[in-house]
Amino acid sequence: MGSFSIWHWLVVLAIVVLVFGTKKLRNLGSDLGGAVRGFKEGMKGAEEESTPPPPAQQVTGHSIKSEIEEKDQTKV
C-alpha cells in the first residue's frame, strides 16, 4: 500500500502531459539540462582557479653582482 504501481505513475504522467503539454515539458527539460551543465562548468572553473601556480624560479645573486660591476666600470 505504501508504494505506487506502474499504472499509478503512468496516469500521473498522462495528467502532467495534458496539463502542461509536450512543448513546455521539452523546454523545461532543456532549461534544467542547461542549468546543470552551467553548474558543472562553474565547479570545474572553480577547481582550476584554486590550484596554486608553480613556484617562480629563484634568481641567483651572480647576475645582480655582474650588473653592478658593469655599472661601476661605465662610471669610471
UniProtKB/Swiss-Prot annotation:
Family, similarity comment: Belongs to the TatA/E family.
Stated name of the protein: Sec-independent protein translocase protein TatA
Annotated TM spans: 1-21
Its job: Part of the twin-arginine translocation (Tat) system that transports large folded proteins containing a characteristic twin-arginine motif in their signal peptide across membranes. TatA could form the protein-conducting channel of the Tat system.
One Pfam family per UniProt: TatA_B_E
Keywords: Cell inner membrane, Cell membrane, Membrane, Protein transport, Translocation, Transmembrane, Transmembrane helix, Transport
GO cellular component entries: TAT protein transport complex
Location, primary (coarse class): membrane
Compartment(s) where it occurs, according to its Swiss-Prot or TrEMBL record: Cell inner membrane
